[in-house]
Amino acid sequence: EWVPVEFEMIPYVESIDAIARFFLKEIRPEFELYVSPINLDPVAPLMPISTPVGYATELAEATGRFYTQGMPEDTNALNEGVFNNADFMTQVAMVHTEIRNQFDYVLNEFRGGFLFYYFGNLDQVSHMMWRAMDPEHPAHDPIADAPYANAVIDRYVDADDFIGETLGKLPENTTLVVMSDHGFTSW
């Protein structure tokens, strides 16, 4: 769940509304609490974060608060060892649900013209988990990666299912373009 946080800029005059997620990793033997990067609160952003200006607030009110900065899958947490594979994939699933809910809202509100929607989930999982399915990858760990050997393939299957669902919701004579900014291959 998102936790609203407030940063006082000028005491009693000005503050910044933000949000963060907290993930209790461990209590003992060492206390470990992960805090997501601080995000502008889309319900009350300090500055415009969407066009039109009020759209982020509308989307947040319709679907819930959401990530407003960086890569929500938080690849840096995995790279730096803050997340293990399981933590990362839990984060991926949470972000995926958030994005899907937003897309459903956007698609249901769409009345014509051009709609572009970016799903970064597959890209981020491919960057971070390709090693799990590639025994020749220099970062491959046969024990730690074994449960995640299908992580990339599972994202493709999910994307394919999602495209099918989307096609079923589109009116006749609508063109759907699915594209990628790049592909992936072994190390």
Mark where each language-model region is.
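Extracellular loop and loop/strand-boundary signature of outer-membrane beta-barrel proteins
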Residues: P147-V152
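Metal-dependent active-site segment of extracytoplasmic phospho-/sulfohydrolases and closely related
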Residues: D154-W187
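His/Asp/Glu-rich, glycine-adjacent segments
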Residues: E1-P142
